[in-house]
Amino acid sequence: VLNKQILATGYNGAPVGMRHCGEVGCIRQQQGVPSGERHELCRGLHAEQNVIIQAALHGAKLAGATVYCTHHPCVVCAKMLINAGVARVVFRGDYPDELARQMLSEAGVEISVFPKK
């Protein structure tokens, strides 16, 4: 979001044209990989990754924008948001990734928790 305009949207899911984990099974569950570890062992992309891709595909610049997401970004998404120039991240649920917090803070990305009703 920039200047009260939605620039792009993203969601957690498999790449375009590929079957979702619900259809083929979750490799992370099958291998007992805990949440927050071994991000490369997943068919899906995080919503933050998809929003950056969608913005790029449609020519929208995210520099200075605010990204709203369900949980605090993981470190992979945090690095991508930093490089995309995102100025602020607003999330509802926490995610235990201290390195992501540190990197966003060091990069000057504002972090806000969306208030619960």
PLM region descriptions:
Residues 1-117:
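Zinc-dependent deaminase catalytic domain
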